[in-house]
Swiss-Prot record:
This is Aspartyl/glutamyl-tRNA(Asn/Gln) amidotransferase subunit B. It is an enzyme of class 6 (ligase). GO terms for molecular function: asparaginyl-tRNA synthase (glutamine-hydrolyzing) activity; ATP binding; glutaminyl-tRNA synthase (glutamine-hydrolyzing) activity. Keywords: ATP-binding, Ligase, Nucleotide-binding, Protein biosynthesis. It catalyses: L-glutamyl-tRNA(Gln) + L-glutamine + ATP + H2O = L-glutaminyl-tRNA(Gln) + L-glutamate + ADP + phosphate + H(+); L-aspartyl-tRNA(Asn) + L-glutamine + ATP + H2O = L-asparaginyl-tRNA(Asn) + L-glutamate + ADP + phosphate + 2 H(+). Allows the formation of correctly charged Asn-tRNA(Asn) or Gln-tRNA(Gln) through the transamidation of misacylated Asp-tRNA(Asn) or Glu-tRNA(Gln) in organisms which lack either or both of asparaginyl-tRNA or glutaminyl-tRNA synthetases. The reaction takes place in the presence of glutamine and ATP through an activated phospho-Asp-tRNA(Asn) or phospho-Glu-tRNA(Gln). The gene is gatB. Its EC number is 6.3.5.-. InterPro entries: Asn/Gln-tRNA_amidoTrfase_suB/E (IPR017959), Asn/Gln-tRNA_Trfase_suB/E_cat (IPR006075), Asn/Gln_amidotransferase (IPR018027), Asn/Gln_tRNA_amidoTrase-B-like (IPR003789), GatB (IPR004413), GatB_C_1 (IPR042114), GatB_Yqey_C_2 (IPR023168), Gln-tRNA_amidoTrfase_suB_CS (IPR017958). GO terms for biological process: glutaminyl-tRNAGln biosynthesis via transamidation; translation.
Length: 498
C-alpha cells in the first residue's frame, strides 16, 4: 500500500481521513412534502406549507427517497435495516424554519458497508483498498442564505429546504489525499450508476465534509477538524493537504489542534475557523413524534435489489475477463456512466459493422473511445459538433481501419471531417483520397526504386544493421505520400531484403 506521510520538523506524521458525503436524492419531490426539487427555480418558488413549517403541517415520507437510499446501500454491500426511525436535530438558523432538522441519528436506514478503491500508480495508490462505510442515513436539507442581494440584509431561499439527502459516512480508513479523491470519485460513480444522485458537485447535489487528523504512525487518533461543504474532488484533496500540514505545524510549534468546524476558501487553498465543533448532545436529538418508524417489507427490498444495474466493479471485471481489456482501460471505461454507455454503444455498432464478436474488436474500440476520439474532439474545440459523431459513423471508420483501408492518421482526418460537417465516412475517404494503397505492384515499384538508390544501406542491413529496416519503411511511406499500407510495405521489404 502506498505510504503518504507529512514530513515535519520532528519526524513523520500520518494523516487520518474520514468523509461525510451529502448526496441529494434523485426524486421529483422533497423528503416530506410534494414540492418540486428542480434546480435553478426562482427563489422560494418551490416551498410547500410543510417546508415552511406552517402550524399543523405534518411530514409524510416520500417512498421514492427511501427506495433510492436503500438501493444505494445495496450497491455498497451494506446492511439494510428493516426498522429505522427519524430523529429531530435541534438548532436555530435562519434557513431552517422548523427550528430542527429531521435526520436519523440512532437508527439509520442503512448500516455498515464498504467501497473498493482500485490501485492507480499514477495517483499514488499502489494497491486496491477497501474503505469501510459506517452508515447511510436520510435527512432534510436546509435552505440557503443569500448575502449578495442587499447591502444590509440577507435573504432566505427555501427552495432547497426539505430536499432529501443521503449522508454517507465513511470510516476513518483513508490515509492520503489520493485515497480520498479516489473514494469520492468511486462513490459518485456508484450513485450515478444506481441513479440515486446525479453527483453534480458544482450544483451542490453532492458535497463532502472532510474530517482530518494527524498522528505519529501507529499511535492513537489525534484531534480532528471538519471542513464543511467541499464541492469538488480537487478541493477535497486540497483541504486534506492544507489541514494536515497546518495541524503538524501547530503541534510541532507547541500548540494543540482544536476540535472545530472549518470552511475552505478555494481562492487561497486554505481553511479557516467557522465554529467550535458540536457533539451530538449539543443538538438534543430525540425521536420525531410526527413520524412513525420505517418498517421495510421483504417485497420492497426484493424490488429494490432487482432494480440495481451492473455496478462499476462487476462491469470492470467483465470487461477484463470477457472482453480481454487491460485493467487500465477497464477502469477508465467504467469510471463514469456516460463513458461506459458510449463505449458499449460503439462496441455493439463496430462488432456489427465488422461482422465479428465484441471481444475481437473490444481493444480497438476501447483505444478509440479513450484516446483517439477525445483527442480529436479536444483539438477541434468549438468546431467539433459531437452530435455528428454517431456510433454508426465511428463504427464505419473503425471498420475501414480494421480492413486496412485507412491508417490511424487517416482515421483521425476522416473523424475530424465527420465532426465538422457530418457525412458518410466511406464517402469522405473516397472523395478526399484518404485511403491506404494496398496495391502490391505500386508499392513494390516504389520499394525497388528506393533499394536501387540506396545499395550501400542495403549491404549494411544485410551485414546485420537491422535498424535500417525502419529507414526503408520511412522512405517507402514518403514515396507513397503516407498512403501505403504499412503491413504490405513491411512484408514486401522483408521478402526483398531477406
Amino acid at each position: 500500500m502506498s505510504t503518504y506521510r507529512i514530513q515535519g520538523a520532528t519526524g513523520e506524521w500520518e494523516v487520518v481521513i474520514g468523509l461525510e458525503v451529502h448526496a441529494q436524492v434523485t426524486s421529483n419531490a422533497k423528503l416530506f412534502s410534494g414540492a418540486s426539487t428542480e434546480f435553478g427555480a426562482e427563489p422560494n418558488a418551490q416551498v410547500s406549507l410543510v417546508d415552511a413549517a406552517m402550524p399543523g403541517m405534518l411530514p409524510v415520507p416520500n417512498r421514492e427517497c427511501i427506495r433510492q437510499a436503500v438501493r444505494t446501500g445495496m450497491a455498497i454491500e451494506a446492511q439494510i435495516n428493516t426498522w429505522s426511525r427519524f430523529d429531530r436535530k435541534n438548532y436555530f438558523y435562519a434557513d431552517l424554519p422548523q427550528g430542527y432538522q429531521i435526520s436519523q441519528l440512532y437508527h439509520p436506514l442503512v448500516g455498515e458497508g464498504q467501497l473498493l478503491i482500485e490501485a492507480d500508480e499514477k495517483a499514488g495508490i499502489s494497491e486496491d483498498k477497501v474503505i469501510g462505510i459506517e452508515r447511510i442515513h436520510v435527512e432534510q436539507d436546509a435552505g440557503k442564505l443569500m448575502h449578495d442581494q442587499h447591502p444590509t440584509m440577507s435573504y432566505v431561499d427555501l427552495n432547497r429546504c426539505g430536499v432529501a439527502l443521503m449522508e454517507i459516512v465513511s470510516r476513518p480508513d483513508m490515509r492520503s489525499p489520493a485515497e480520498a479523491g479516489a473514494y469520492v470519485r468511486k462513490l459518485r460513480a456508484i450513485l450515478r450508476y444506481v441513479g440515486s444522485c446525479d453527483g453534480n458537485m458544482e450544483e451542490g447535489s453532492m458535497r463532502a465534509d472532510v474530517n482530518v487528523s494527524v498522528r505519529r504512525p501507529g499511535e492513537e487518533f489525534g484531534t480532528r477538524t471538519e471542513t464543511k461543504n467541499v464541492n469538488s474532488v480537487r478541493f477535497v484533496m486540497q483541504v486534506i493537504e492544507y489541514e494536515a500540514n497546518r495541524q503538524v505545524d501547530l503541534i510541532e510549534s507547541g500548540g494543540a489542534v482544536e476540535q472545530e468546524t472549518r470552511l475552505f476558501d478555494p481562492g487561497t487553498g486554505t481553511t479557516r475557523t467557522m465554529r467550535s465543533k458540536e457533539d451530538a448532545h449539543d443538538y438534543r436529538y430525540f425521536p420525531d413524534p410526527d413520524l412513525l418508524p420505517l418498517e421495510l417489507e421483504d417485497s420492497f427490498l426484493d424490488e429494490c435489489r432487482a432494480s440495481l444495474p451492473e455496478l462499476p466493479d462487476a462491469k470492470r471485471q467483465r470487461y477484463e475477463n470477457e472482453l480481454g481489456l487491460t485493467p487500465y482501460n477497464a477502469r477508465e471505461l467504467t469510471a463514469e456512466v456516460e463513458t461506459f454507455a458510449r463505449f458499449e454503444t460503439l462496441l455493439a455498432a463496430t462488432a456489427k459493422a465488422i461482422g465479428e464478436d465484441e471481444k475481437k474488436v473490444a481493444t480497438q474500440v476501447a483505444n478509440w473511445a479513450l484516446s483517439v476520439a477525445p483527442g480529436v474532439i479536444k483539438s477541434l474545440g468549438d468546431e467539433a459538433h459531437v452530435e455528428n459523431a454517431t456510433a454508426e459513423r465511428q463504427a464505419a471508420i473503425l471498420k475501414m481501419q480494421d480492413a486496412g483501408e485507412i491508417s490511424g492518421g487517416q482515421a483521425k482526418e476522416i473523424f475530424e471531417i465527420v465532426l465538422k460537417e457530418g457525412g458518410d465516412p466511406a464517402t469522405i475517404a473516397d472523395e478526399k483520397g484518404l485511403k491506404q494503397v494496398s496495391d502490391t505492384g505500386a508499392i513494390e515499384a516504389a520499394i525497388d526504386e528506393i533499394l536501387a538508390n540506396n545499395e550501400d544501406k542495403v549491404e549494411q542491413y544485410k551485414c546485420g544493421k537491422d535498424k535500417l529496416f525502419g529507414f526503408f519503411v520511412g522512405q517507402t511511406m514518403k514515396a507513397m505520400q503516407g498512403k501505403a499500407n504499412p503491413a504490405v510495405v513491411n512484408q514486401i521489404l522483408k521478402d526483398k531484403l531477406g
